[in-house]
Structures are given as structure tokens and as C-alpha cells.
Amino acid sequence: MASVNVDFEQAGELKIGQVGIANLRVRTLDVPRLVQEMRERVSRAPKLFGRAAVILDFGGLSQVPDLATAKALLDGLRDAGVLPVALAYGTSEIDLLSQQLGVPLLAKFRAQYEPTAVSPPPPPPPPARAEPAPPAARPAPGRMQRTAVRSGQQLYAENCDLTVLSTVGAGAEVIADGSIHIYGTLRGRALAGAQGNPDARIFCRDFHAELVAIAGHYKVLDDVPMDLRGKAVQVWLEQDQIKIAALD
């Protein structure tokens, strides 16, 4: 039989990149309550949450849900308007559940939650000659965006702050591991402290954001007082609550 050569580079290019996937940390197995909460969120912000890809994280539960409950939850969330695409929390029980449900288990969550076996402490190392401390690592320079971030675009500043000198349009998303400074209008989404830094902040000269988030905590435009819209504001996290205040 003649062999067939397939040029995969021309047929399709596969890359693992930064994607906007929401993480739903499940705190109860009350499926109707979970579904109703999600339905309300989609209703309040359909452009943000409608058909959003969602990872289910059962790490906050004392017991893994059974297959019937997990199926009911996935079906309910789809009916509420979001798309559950994977499971987080890489224990063996969750791994089995993901196989039974036919959804992937995201490996990047395993190291965060997987308990490790306790091993005896290693013997103390022999005394070593004191070495001078290495110089402190310089922080990564901030990323600067001089042109507008348009609808459908996503901009990510890894391990640094992000400065945008123009507009962030509706449907656009800017993300930074540090703080975000926007000198134009913010109509899209801004997510600071993306790797969990609660001290990150968002500064904006003209605030109309669809969503702002810091270290995973978020607030949508419908929750923002009318007197702050269109103003220069700063956004910060205080006791796990998003705070927004005018700069003027």
C-alpha cells in the first residue's frame, strides 16, 4: 500500500496560547442553585458570559460529585448559557470523573491542588562556604500599547504592568500580571493581577468597562454606580471586594 504524506504545517497550525476561559469554583452540589446563579450572571452580562467557556473546579468540595450529579450540572450550565469545557483539580477521582464525562482535565491545575506524599526530611547538607548574595532580579519592563485595542483583540502583559495610550474597545480584553494604566476610554475588559497579585490596580481616564477584575475578583458594568461612568477612576481589591473610586 502506498504511503500518504500529509503536510500538517499546511493543513493546520496548532498553538497553545493565552485564552479567555472562566473558572467556576464549585462550593456546593446544589445543582439548581448553581444553575440559577449562572443564569442570572449571563442575563446581567450576556456579552461577557453568554456562551463563555467554563472550567469546573471541584477543589473546594469535601467530596467529589458522583457521575449523575456532574452530568446534571453540566447540562444545567449549558442550559443557563455557558459552555463547560473541562474539569480542574487533578486528583485521581476527578481524573476518572473527567473520563466518564468525556471532558478534559486541565493539567495546569494539577500542581496547584494535588496533595503530595510526605517524605522524610533529607539529611542536612555539609556546611558550605558563604557566597555573596546574587543581585536582586530587575523587574520586567512594563508593556506599552500605543494604538487602540479593538473589539475581539486580547492583549496580555506577562509578569509586568500594562500601559495603553489609546482606547480599549468594547469586546476587547487587556490582561496584565501587574497593574493596568489606560489613558483613553475603557469599554472592554481589563484584568489586572492575572497571576493572583491582590495589590495590582487598574487606572483609567474614561471608564465604561464591560468588566474589571483583579486577582480573579470581578465587577461588571451593571454593578458600577452611574456617577463613576465616564470618569477617571482607579480600581483596587480590598478584603476580596472590588473597589472603584474617582480620581478627580
Swiss-Prot record:
This is Probable septum site-determining protein MinC. Pfam families: MinC_C, MinC_N. Interacts with MinD and FtsZ. It comes from Xanthomonas euvesicatoria pv. vesicatoria (strain 85-10). Cell division inhibitor that blocks the formation of polar Z ring septums. Rapidly oscillates between the poles of the cell to destabilize FtsZ filaments that have formed before they mature into polar Z rings. Prevents FtsZ polymerization. Gene3D superfamilies: 2.160.20.70, 3.30.70.260. Belongs to the MinC family. The keyword Cell cycle applies.
